[in-house]
Amino acid sequence: MGGKDFQIYMDYHEKSGTGAKSPDNIEADTKSRRKTSKTEWSLFPGFYDRIVSVFGLPEIDLFVSRTSAKCQRYVSWDSDPEAFAIDAFTLYWKLFFFDVFLPFAILPKVLQKIAYDKAIGFLVVPYWKTQSWYPLFTSLLTKVLIVLRPHTNMLNCSDRVHPMGSSLNLVAGILSGTPS
């Protein structure tokens, strides 16, 4: 069906009302409303518990969804009626002891926000010493790092395991934007 034929088809069905209406098309309607992230990786609870046993329980979880939040209070990426707020970058982080485990691509922005807000919390990041953000990460550290050795089940997203889980070294540290 070419472009013109498709447009004629669509015009006909819109005018005649023969397209499937939402109540009649339950499967498509349900799938279109479901919010699932295929990229929101989360630490397996045992690894997270190890970090919390050393650093303490955070007050708020930043950059998560309802399904991946580890704290009762969390800040979501997207509209969520149960979230404390949407978009963690709009908050003043100094008010909370937070935890962050996020897409690695925004680590530089997160580290700058910690420094700017003079905030304190813990981050879990890849042990990538050659990355441009790593010196800033180490300059904000207040305690020794917790090293999380590679493990197949270390990172999960719904029922999937991360393809790099068995080879990725992660580190966790408390960071503070207040100079010591």
Model-assigned labels for residue ranges:
Residues 167-172:
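Short hydrophobic/aromatic beta-strand or adjacent loop that forms the aromatic wall/cage
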